[in-house]
Amino acid sequence: MQFTHLVALALALATSEAAHQGFNYGNTKSDGSAKSQADFQAEFSTAKNLVGTSGFTSARLYTMIQGGTANTPISAIPAAITEQTSLLLGLWASGGNFANEIAALKAAIAQYGDDLAKLVVGISVGSEDLYRNSVDGVKANAGIGTNPDEIVSYINEVRSTIAGTKLSGAPIGHVDTWTAWVNGSNSAVIDACDWLGFDGYPYFQNTMANSISDAKALFDESVAKTQAVAKGKEVWITETGWPVSGKTENLAVANLANAKTYWDEVGCPLFGKTNTWWYILQDADPVTPNPSFGIVGSTLSTTPLFDLSCSASSSSSAAASSTAGPSASSVIGGKASGFTTAAANSAKPTFTVGKGPGGSYNGTGFWNSTSSARPSSSAISGSSSGSAAGSSGSSGSSGSGASGASGQSSSSTGSSSAPSTSNILSNAASGLSGSICGAVVAVCLALAAL
């Protein structure tokens, strides 16, 4: 009987090891109309049941605010609770509306409590604000940005807001392009973060050789550059993708075949190993943008536009070729969640109430804008840069770089002596060393002690 319980524990720990995989979700449709709870719920349900996949069960959000309101909590939250979709919450940090984002965050915590907390993977303060504030962002007409000091101030404000609440200790990060992360003037933001969100789009790196055959190398290089400045903090892949239709960017051709290749070569090695939010499930309802990144067309369907199945070889090869693999443990529930460097993780967050990435919103206007949010045609060299929190598409694009994240892996690797069975059981919720190996070792040690 005891053996059965230990095996069940090992399986539970192994299951919890898989990283979060999901999509970005805007709070408006491509025509600027606000999404309802039913809209979000339909998207989350579709993502969980996509043909050829194990299910995309996480959502990254760009804002806490429901489209068309001042500071009402976004209806993606009750939709996620119904569908049990994990959330990477987001607060829009450009344009001077942050007080309303904080108000919506407070209201959401008060209204949804534990139901929300158990789904939260982390909180993102801003999205590509530093890129939009950069010379490249201004040149690309990417929209209003924010300076690093202000982002740090906002991060501290969010920490104060969640202190003592159900979300207390939630890992807080910032999402930006790799070019923003490697810019030394933004280092204070890295210091303030628990994890770094990486947005990268080789399709937009139009000053480089960026054909689909170059895409994986460009992506890997930009992630590596981000890792190099991340100070040992985890890098979460918060946006990437390849368009299924649209204009050509230098050597990058937008079509289904190339979108499939990018999915296979870049996406498959990430899924289940590194927290990843793909761009995007659907961006063509009711208007198809140019370019369009949606893996389903104008009609929401569990049947994608191209084959999403990942072969064992595509999943393992790129994982092996990464500069640094995903950390063995995560800030949440002991899950592998991001890329880390070899640097020691000295301040690992201990947030344990939620699991999974979340839905996001992109836009070139703010949350009640009618603008479509698509990557800008004047992109300079790489990752997309949404300039406001509106539609389901991503906006202006920036460079090809690296970003770091600070949802660091645990520095603990387990005791040198065999733990007792009771200790193993009591520590199971924290993942024991945060890895599948830890779960297996735990069971072996427990069996040996019987």
From Swiss-Prot:
Q: What are the glycosylated positions?
A: N183, N362, N368
Q: Where in the cell is it found?
A: Cell membrane; Secreted, Cell wall
> Which Pfam families does this chain map to?
Glyco_hydro_17 (PF00332)
Keyword Secreted appears in the UniProt entry: yes
PTM per Swiss-Prot/TrEMBL: The GPI-anchor is attached to the protein in the endoplasmic reticulum and serves to target the protein to the cell surface. There, the glucosamine-inositol phospholipid moiety is cleaved off and the GPI-modified mannoprotein is covalently attached via its lipidless GPI glycan remnant to the 1,6-beta-glucan of the outer cell wall layer.
- Record has RNA-binding as a keyword: no
At the top of the EC hierarchy, this enzyme's class is: hydrolase
- Catalytic center residues: E128, E239
| Propeptide residue span(s) | 428-450
Note the lipidated residues of kind GPI-anchor amidated asparagine.
Answer: N427
Q: What is its main location?
A: membrane
| Superkingdom of the organism of origin | Eukaryota
- Membrane-related topology note: Lipid-anchor; GPI-anchor
The secretion signal range is: 1-18
The UniProt entry's sequence similarity note says: Belongs to the glycosyl hydrolase 17 family.
Protein name, UniProt field: Probable glucan endo-1,3-beta-glucosidase eglC
Which species does this protein come from? Answer: Aspergillus fumigatus (strain CBS 144.89 / FGSC A1163 / CEA10) (Neosartorya fumigata)
